[in-house]
Amino acid sequence: MLKTKQQIIALNRFRCWTSNLPGLQQQCRNQSTVTAASSEWEQAKPLSEMPTISPFQLLRHFLPGGKYTNLDTTQLMLAFRRDFGPIVYFKGSLGKPDVVMTNNPHDFEKALHNQGIWPMRPGMEYLSYHRQVHRKDIFQGVEGLLGSQGEAWGSFRSAVNPVLMQPKNVHLYFNKMSEVNKEFMERIRKIRDPQTLEVPDNFEEEINRWTLESVSVVALDKQLGLITKNRDDPTPKRLFKALTDFFEASGDLEFQPSIWKYIKTPTFKKAIRSLDEITDITKMYVDEAFERIEAENKNRNVEKPENEKSVLEKLVKIDKQIAMVMAMDMLMAGVDTTSSTFTGLLLCLAKNPEKQKKLREEIMQLLPQKDSEFNEAVFKNMPYLRACIKESLRVYPLTVGNARTQANDVVISGYRVPKGTLISMNSVTLIKDDAHYPRASEFLPERWLRASKENEKSAECPHALKASSPFVYLPFGFGSRSCIGRRIAEMELELGIARLIRNFHVEFNYPTDNAFKSLLISVPNIPLKFKFTDVDN
């Protein structure tokens, strides 16, 4: 294992070294860029002139009775923009770094192109503490992706990238995920009210079970039976509760002044307890998966062909400890995130029946029967479904934006921002603004489609609906630190929504105001009493 890690680190360093050996022509271009940047820096205003507030004044606003008390993260970002304008500087205190918070997509682009070879996305230091200190017996120096930084992050990412970012590896799971989705459809039929056809208030738990079952197909290479067979197993409920507790605590620890490094606060203790529970349960699942893989390999006369090996088998071949931590990260990061995205899309389709009808027409051409199977050709030919997912992520964003520590000095909105400063890029304040998304209050999947001769003169021509900048909202991140589970999450959503819309007409006959609350990510905030009416075959 040590040899493997040393090889990964050496490879990373070699890549960094070779990336600094450009040709003479590139050197000239770089020199020109440096000169332009130097001139821009000289003409920019000093950071001291940027709108700001003292750490003490900011802390007062978070105390009981303060104007930022009890705001969720989305509400907080909107309040900051209202109070300080498009950009504000917060001096670091209580363990927090200096932060420049901007609401300008041009700043987003500059900050994301200034993130360096190992992009720093600070945050979740309590997760690093949990893995490095509190449970170092389990993690043994392998931190994973969620809370690590620098070379440790780069080494781990380099190890798992070839497996998780390879489309053909993800496509191994068409049939297994299809079985999970069929089981979910039958569960909906069983739990809905026979008269109203509405599902119970706690349908969110059913969505979470479906999501965890789907993620487990990849992370653990098996179905856990959470939808029907093993419903009475208390372990999944413990995991769901721990994940919820973790996200609730994380929202406070990430976005509000915290003194947990000095005093172990109740919120910090809650986060650590939930991480203990998540770690113990996911390790149990992962250990079972390892035992199963070893038993299967012993019973084989010949080694399984490489193109038939699962993601977990390929990760184990790299390093067993890396495989275990990556499986944990997939389970931790892949349940609530996908559940919230799935819920947001269902709400959008339920409240926009004409868009749901258009989507169903696309799906029925590819899946003529309710139980028709997916294949790669079908999977590639669903542009409107993908557009619906992208638009729902705009309407119901999963996070408030992105953040990166700057690798070099940079000019942001005309101000000098020194390297090492954290730039917070607040997309959530822009995505409902007509200046950035025309007709921003409407659910318009068409804005994500390619223009055609038929629609180029219509009001729904994609060119007329595009964002003001591709950097306004990047739900899966940007560059080398973009979401490593994107392909898995997209396939899970596409297969799940396609199967559901092929089987049911979806309605939601209740208000959707404040449908989500914003913690570390957005999570449902209302009972999800969807009405599911069967669609004819």
From Swiss-Prot:
Disulfide feature: none
Cofactor(s) this protein requires: heme
Binding site for heme: C483
Annotated InterPro entries: CYP11_CYP27_families, Cyt_P450, Cyt_P450_CS, Cyt_P450_E_grp-I, Cyt_P450_sf
E.C. number: 1.14.-.-
Entries under PROSITE patterns matching the protein: CYTOCHROME_P450 (PS00086)
Domain of life: Eukaryota
Classification via Gene3D superfamilies: Cytochrome P450 (1.10.630.10)
Enzyme class: oxidoreductase
Alphabetic keyword roster: Heme, Iron, Metal-binding, Monooxygenase, Oxidoreductase
Secretion signal span: none
Molecular function, one GO term: iron ion binding
CDD domains: CYP24A1-like
Family: Belongs to the cytochrome P450 family.
Name of protein: Cytochrome P450 CYP12A2
